[in-house]
Amino acid sequence: EWYQKDYQSFIEYNITDVELVDKLEDKMKLIELCLTMAYDAKVNYVDVLGSVKYWDILIYNHLRKKNIVIPQKRKNTKAEKYEGAYVKDPIVGMHNWVMSFDLNSLYPHLIMQYNISPETLYGQQKVKDMTVDKLLDKKVDTSILKGVTLTPNGALFKTDTKGCLPEITESMYNDRVTFKRKMLEAKQEYENTKDPKLLKDISRYNNIQMAKKISLNSAYGAIGNAYFRYYDLLVAEAITTSGQLSIRWIEHALNEYLNTLLGTDKHDYVLASDTDSVYITFDKLVNKVFGERQDTTKIINFLDTIATQKIEPFIDKSYSELAGYVNAYSNKMNMKREVIADKGIWTAKKRYILNAHDVEGVRYKEPQLKIMGIEAVKSSTPAPCRQKIKDALKIIMSGDEKMLNTFIQEFREEFMKLPVEDIAYPRSVNGIKKFTSDSGLF
């Protein structure tokens, strides 16, 4: 109807749409991301939106180079549920001097470490009554493992030859490391020079490394999908339970290390942990070294040194012990410091704010808020409120209670005067006809 009655405005509206998409692509480069993934895997563009067809073709091309014929697809029953990732209940509240440590590409590295692949699985029989807790407490005698490695769900994988999945993921990961390094170098240069040309370089390098990251992480999802050619519940669960073991292993090890270092007993220094990260408070260490004379820059430099020279080597040693204990194909767990924050607040699982001064070696002149799961980053929160929540969080980090109360009261008055279209958001309502019609109301 619009097309027929007002052709000119219809055309103008569509031109505006095209311009907006072009601007979004110039900044986000999402189309470029899809194209990068499609060319990498030799798939159609639509296939990058899922993991099943994408990885089916990746594996086919990899095996074809080796003159290996892929198996026929089997009709699988509906996929059963299996164990997921581990997320620790956080220590709720505000904490000072927090550092986070992140495992690089956890699931792909678990595939490499345990040589997880359809053809390396040692039969469908599991080791009975095997759990993450038993391996954490070293209640399992693993000295009998010869030519196989053990995962916490009881699956065994051969270690005499490298599987096709570890080969593909290792190649992808090496490419990702290259482009992520280029992205971080460009980010640091931008922080120093503020040259706007660098923003496009950052976006381009980020998209290439993201293409690799998405491809790597989707391998595990494909294996657990009943429509995948190489679907195997035992293999998928081997990956997730091995991830649980890795993050809980290092949580226990770091707590023991810091309790010994600081002369405390059973104090929990790990504030929170999720699939591939741990968040640790170093407040006691900072107070012990600096006392009341606390210079922010000196403390950040000190914590950076502690992370690289003490914590990371200890983590490497701990993960080497784990790899030896389960007779892994190789030790691929690589955990590095991500964030240094002077303050962090947790409200629940995966809901936190960090006042970050340094992220992955990129030092900020002014601290940046790293927000996860808080209303300030939720699209369902009205835009004016999202910005004000962020402003309020900055006051929480650097101001006092009086400043915060004043800010809230001022915005309360401002909010009441805002037009409804600025603070409303679309939501559907069910059953309007049922509850408003004369026949159905009573």
Protein language model regions, located:
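Active-site palm subdomain of RNA-directed nucleic acid polymerases
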Residues: 247-275
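C-terminal polymerase-core module
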Residues: 279-442
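Charge-dense polyanion-binding interfaces
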Residues: 118-167, 298-323
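Intrinsically disordered or highly flexible coil/loop and linker segments, enriched in small
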Residues: 19-20, 24-37, 68-72, 112, ...
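Short, Φ-rich (hydrophobic/aromatic) sequence segments
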Residues: 1, 59, 111, 159, ...
